[in-house]
Swiss-Prot record:
Residues 1-131 are annotated as: Q domain. WD repeat Groucho/TLE family members are characterized by 5 regions, a glutamine-rich Q domain, a glycine/proline-rich GP domain, a central CcN domain, containing a nuclear localization signal, and a serine/proline-rich SP domain. The most highly conserved are the N-terminal Q domain and the C-terminal WD-repeat domain. Residues 146-157, 255-264, 282-297 have a biased composition (Low complexity). Residues 267-450 are annotated as: SP domain. This is Transducin-like enhancer protein 1. It comes from Mus musculus (Mouse). It comes from the Eukaryota. Highly expressed in liver and lung. Detected at slightly lower levels in heart, brain, kidney and testis. Detected in fetal and adult stomach and small intestine, in adult ileum, duodenum and colon. Expressed in bone marrow-derived macrophages. GO terms for cellular component: cytoplasm; nucleus; transcription regulator complex. One of its GO terms (biological process) is Wnt signaling pathway.
Amino acid sequence: MFPQSRHPTPHQAAGQPFKFTIPESLDRIKEEFQFLQAQYHSLKLECEKLASEKTEMQRHYVMYYEMSYGLNIEMHKQTEIAKRLNTICAQVIPFLSQEHQQQVAQAVERAKQVTMAELNAIIGQQQLQAQHLSHGHGPPVPLTPHPSGLQPPGIPPLGGSASLLALSSALSGQSHLAIKDDKKHHDAERHRDRESGTSNSLLVPDSLRSTDKRRNGPEFSSDIKKRKVDDKDNYDSDGDKSDDNLVVDVSNEDPSSPHASPTHSPRENGIDKNRLLKKDASGSPASTASSGSSSSLKSKEVSLHEKANTPVLKSSTPTPRSDMPTPGTSATPGLRPGLGKPPAMEPLVNQAAAGLRTPLAVPGPYPAPFGMVPHAGMNGELTSPGAAYAGLHSMSPQMSAAAAAAAAAVVAYGRSPMVGFDPPPHMRVPSIPPNLAGIPGGKPAYSFHVTADGQMQPVPFPPDALIGPGIPRHARQINTLNHGEVVCAVTISNPTRHVYTGGKGCVKVWDISHPGNKSPVSQLDCLNRDNYIRSCKLLPDGCTLIVGGEASTLSIWDLAAPTPRIKAELTSSAPACYALAISPDSKVCFSCCSDGNIAVWDLHNQTLVRQFQGHTDGASCIDISNDGTKLWTGGLDNTVRSWDLREGRQLQQHDFTSQIFSLGYCPTGEWLAVGMESSNVEVLHVNKPDKYQLHLHESCVLSLKFAYCGKWFVSTGKDNLLNAWRTPYGASIFQSKESSSVLSCDISVDDKYIVTGSGDKKATVYEVIY
């Protein structure tokens, strides 16, 4: 790793005995640190391998249990048939002649005398027949030559794993699997298995109930909270969750705190945070306030188990999650996995696809050569990754094409060909040339260019992707604002002095010009006490704040008064507002409503002047072009729409396969970034069909904001991450890990500060270092 010969330092003459110097000591420490990293990585791989083996064993257990249950049912059925036939024989025999009666009675008695030799012969014959029927899928599963193991005629013997799956499908109607898969990734997400009884006392592991659709959005209410203590382990399956609901991380919510009316729930940028991936059900008795859409929002439960640590900035290159959705899963029909699976096989196939997706490259023994892994500074800031982001993004076009083909193969098949263990690097993705597995840092590609026809290719980043004027090097946490409730909305004043944090029933104002201030300078009580603030926007003059949330009214605050006061309220027909936008001339306010409409308000006359109708479900996020002529909205109906504000009509519609939770329009034009429930970030060109697809988040992307220079943007997610990306191709500039879900974010007008709001009841202020 290091050259053997070093130039003599000023403290060590060339001819003097060897003497430790500070730089060499630091180098040695770095070597040991990287060795520990390698050990950690190998242990992590071993853990993942064991988890995969465990899952496979559970699958086989369920298959065999279904076999046993089906055989038991068939045995009882045949026994009952035999009894009824015996009764019929007993009734019919007396009508025969005496001679025939004796012959038939003897034949019946002989039929009842089945010897072990006959049983073995019958079983062997059935197995041979099944082997011919299985078309060479492997040897049949041997059955014990014992009456209790007699194979009934209705269920042929099975051959190999394919036959096991076939049997699972055949018997699925008899065994009502009540199972669920709660996957947790790395420190935040662990495999947790639960078992729930069925009407037939069938116990099966939870890892087989999940569907690929991770839509678990509960809506919180007081009666739900009362039920939670008794029923916290009895959660509905993921597939039953309302597609409209999101999850707010309220791991530290006071269990005794009051809850809101059951009509609303906290959403960030128009999204119900309760809609996010549900965590460990038994970890916390907490829940939060309610939800918003009157159309189809259901009341559910959630309990999110989070560690309440201070935000930690990662000191290594951001790495795509090992089970990340493979490229093309969002709005790329050409790469979707094939359909046509039998319904009963879907839980097993989905489980395999979720647990066995393969990364495009495999980290080597050391995460990266020395000098390529960014190290944390003395203040905990994250340094620029530099060359560590080269990876697949800087290789030759031929290699990129091969990697894209490998990605397509992973998507097409849904899982790796190796099941039950972690394959060695050279076996992970056969389509990738061997030399790609050894790229610097071993980092899989996380940014893909998608053409109009769905072709995907890893993006080769330009040399100035992470350097140049206006591109940050890292971000440093400088302040923590303890709001006391889940922070679903944040905004920064211009000039940068005050930060506004929206929580439950109030907006708190913080003076960040004096970092020592630990208390808000004022508190603006809005809506009802138990309803969450979903969005707050400052007018450019800095004297007016507009607040929306889980209520049908928007509050307009006069901040220039000696004491901030509400100077007007705007009332709409929708029960909740999920996001707000202000026109550049400050004359018009746009609100995203839970009924899918976009309300247009005249701020001077305080009247509703228009509604844009098009979203078929709640409108979750919104942004406006700098010239004030075009509006972009995202919705829970899986669409992004653009509107012409001069003509009052819809211009474009982009359809996706995932709900839209956040979006941002680049201030310099051309690019629109969209945050998905599927954990992807997609950057669309507003005039061309091609786009970029970014894969670094491990869960739902809850908020997104462009820097005012337009050269970079940030996104936050349920995975506790704050990611900074280069516009438009998504080179990762820096990454910050907080201690809970990051629900909201904002960037100051001078691009020097970032504020995030999180589920652990606080906002975090970062200074952007250039």
